[in-house]
From Swiss-Prot:
It comes from the Bacteria. GO terms for biological process: beta-lactam antibiotic catabolic process; response to antibiotic. The active site is at residue 83. Hydrolyzes carbenicillin. Methicillin and oxacillin are weakly hydrolyzed. This is Beta-lactamase AER-1. Residues 1-37 form the signal peptide. PANTHER family: BETA-LACTAMASE (PTHR35333), BETA-LACTAMASE-TYPE TRANSPEPTIDASE FOLD CONTAINING PROTEIN (PTHR35333:SF3). Its EC number is 3.5.2.6. It catalyses: a beta-lactam + H2O = a substituted beta-amino acid. Disulfide bonds join 90-137. The gene is aer1. The lineage of its organism: Bacteria, Pseudomonadati, Pseudomonadota, Gammaproteobacteria, Aeromonadales. Substrate binds at residues 248-250.
Amino acid sequence: MYVLSVEKPTLRNKFAAGIGVVLVCVVASFIPTPVFALDTTKLIQAVQSEESALHARVGMTVFDSNTGTTWNYRGDERFPLNSTHKTFSCAALLAKVDGKSLSLGQSVSISKEMLVTYSPITEKSLSPETVTFGKICQAAVSYSDNTAANVVFDAIGGATGFNAYMRSIGDEETQLDRKEPELNEGTPGDVRDTTTPNAMVNSLRKILLGDALSASSRSQLTQWMLDDQVAGALLRASLPSDWKIADKTGAGGYGSRSIVAVIWPPSKQPLVVGIYITQTKASMQASNQAIARIGVVLKDTVAP
């Protein structure tokens, strides 16, 4: 149910591997398997404890940039995407910006008829006012504004455009089928609007730490996630003030609660984390507290 794997070498380290081939041949038998920089025993105990307490299904994946290893619990099981899709929807929009087919400065008009539930930013910027795509993505990612997310959805070509973008970065699992708020239904067994923790962590790693986006677009998306205004009760509640976190949360039917994040511990390479909870009758506050407690274990088990 839980897995520890080692990432394959990238192009950037192949050269170093090549020039050291003779040395490797001599001492290979003395080189240990890369060690995960986290105490996976404590992690699995923490996740299973919260899963039991919530009477829920919990999935979690962690990628450790320090060692190139990935750990997961239920990492290949499907969970509702909920609002975690907003980071990836805006990544798809930024890819269009990189391709010169759209500009963050381009303006759109939002009518009253377009408003859906939980739109704290866009409800204040209705037609005849116009709003730039930059502000729209900021609203969607930093404030989880649902109408803003739907505007992005349309701009990237709807579900077809979203899914095509995810496939273009190697994500064969994540799928978006509906707009806000319908996508948050979360009915068990329904594959619509679902993902896996493994897919989310791998895709977020490529987008924020890799080269799926240009440097400027990557920086912009990271900033929107650093400025997340609705995630204070989750992993942020567990981390010291000198740890940076860029995150996006989600919530939906059947007790679904989720978060994807890149975390920068001081003087270390980042961790990429995805936690998904569903099929529980527990309150959102209880799920928030569960994620925060998992975050405490994550923090405490980072290798010194």
